[in-house]
Design a protein with these regions (language model features):
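Charge-rich (acidic/polar
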Residues: 1-213
Length: 213
């Protein structure tokens, strides 16, 4: 509760820093990893029981996913990729803060421009992960299947390509810088809306936690 209150205070007082965002990111990663670790045994059992036909269907879904992502995020010219990325971020931020002001919109454009060809590394790493998952599924009766699936679900970062590892680090730094600047440029109404959204999210998470217990 104290940690959640800290988020409220930070948002309301407009005191957002790079180090604070790094801490929150680490907490989120740890929570995601913990959840993934909890479901891994059941996932391994389910995956091992799949038939060859089901695995073939899964691989077809992977292939379709990659085609769609390449068509949407890689085929457009770079200038269009940058513009569309900025539009997607503007939409996400507006949901949390309300309409962005001109200075904030300009900062979002600068953020998207700085990321450049990040889509290329993102899609390449997605294909890399899917290929490793398919390779593991092809040997799902082997003795090392469980640890391979755990690595794919829990320790995904250990399987990233070197290029994507660097790109992800750069992307995270750019995102933190963007958020710090946006909060610095935010209005009291935007900060109030953000606190309300955080409160609602916390209530939803608490409700889910109660259902699980």
């Amino acid at each position: 509760a104290a940690r959640s209150l800290g988020v409220d205070v930070v948002a309301a007082s407009n005191q957002v820093s790079d180090s604070a965002l790094q801490s929150r990111t680490l907490e989120a990663r740890q929570a995601i990893a913990q959840t993934a670790r909890q479901i891994t045994p059941s996932a391994v059992e389910l995956l091992q029981g799949m038939s060859d036909q089901q695995v073939k269907g899964m691989n077809l879904v992977f292939a379709k996913d990659l085609r769609e992502h390449r068509d949407k995020y890689l085929k457009p010219p770079l200038a269009q990729q940058i513009r569309q990325r900025g539009e997607r971020m503007d939409k996400r931020l507006s949901d949390w803060l309300g309409p962005l002001n001109p200075a904030q919109k300009e900062r979002v454009t600068a953020w998207s421009t700085a990321l450049g060809e990040q889509n290329q590394q993102w899609i390449a790493n997605r294909a890399h992960w899917q290929a490793q998952f398919s390779a593991a599924m092809a040997q799902r009766q082997s003795t090392d299947f469980a640890p391979r699936i755990e690595a794919l679900l829990v320790d995904r970062e250990s399987l990233w390509t070197p290029a994507y590892r660097q790109a992800f680090s750069d992307t995270e730094a750019q995102a933190r810088s963007l958020l710090v600047d946006l909060m610095d440029q935010s209005s009291a109404n935007q900060r109030q809306r953000l606190v309300q959204k955080i409160d609602k999210l916390r209530s939803n998470l608490q409700a889910l936690k109660c259902l699980r217990t």
